Amino acid sequence: MAIQRTFSILKPDATERNITGAINALIEKAGLRIVAQKRIHMTRGQAETFYAVHKERPFFGELVDFMISGPVVVQVLEGENAIAKYRDVMGATDPSKAADGTIRKAHAKSIGENSVHGSDAPETAAIEIAQFFAGNEIVG
């Protein structure tokens, strides 16, 4: 398997409860390296651009409002099969359906406030990483 990078966001519900360290521990326990990380407060424009794929969905406005409601931690994760591995460690979007030991089972408050985002494909990972990180900010 090839080394791959994926993009992660620790969402406002995670930063508000000061559980970013616990989430990072689960990420690292899964064998992923955090090769870039910064805490930011997304602007409305950043959130709308990031979630543009959901623009026509009824929850879009609520999602954008949530993502700008407090700080987030944006990250680049690296490892073998990183995209699938991170999606496994995140768990199902609905925390009640997430497997034991996953981030969402342990920490998500609801389907909407589910603590983390992870890229779903190599193409989206590249786009999402480029939205928040310059190449020299990623240090493997």
From Swiss-Prot:
It comes from the Bacteria. Its EC number is 2.7.4.6. CDD domains: NDPk_I (cd04413). The keyword Signal does not apply. Keywords: ATP-binding, Cytoplasm, Kinase, Magnesium, Metal-binding, Nucleotide metabolism, Nucleotide-binding, Phosphoprotein, Transferase. It catalyses: a 2'-deoxyribonucleoside 5'-diphosphate + ATP = a 2'-deoxyribonucleoside 5'-triphosphate + ADP; a ribonucleoside 5'-diphosphate + ATP = a ribonucleoside 5'-triphosphate + ADP. Its main location: cytoplasm. The active site is at 117 (pros-phosphohistidine intermediate). GO terms for molecular function: ATP binding; metal ion binding; nucleoside diphosphate kinase activity. GO terms for cellular component: cytoplasm. It holds the Pfam family NDK. Disulfide bonds: none annotated. Its cofactor is Mg(2+). The keyword Cell inner membrane does not apply. SUPFAM superfamilies: Nucleoside diphosphate kinase, NDK (SSF54919). ATP binds at residues 11, 59, 87, 93, 104, 114. PANTHER family: NUCLEOSIDE DIPHOSPHATE KINASE, NUCLEOSIDE DIPHOSPHATE KINASE DDB_G0292928-RELATED. Homotetramer. Belongs to the NDK family. Major role in the synthesis of nucleoside triphosphates other than ATP. The ATP gamma phosphate is transferred to the NDP beta phosphate via a ping-pong mechanism, using a phosphorylated active-site intermediate. This is Nucleoside diphosphate kinase. It comes from Rhodopseudomonas palustris (strain BisB5).
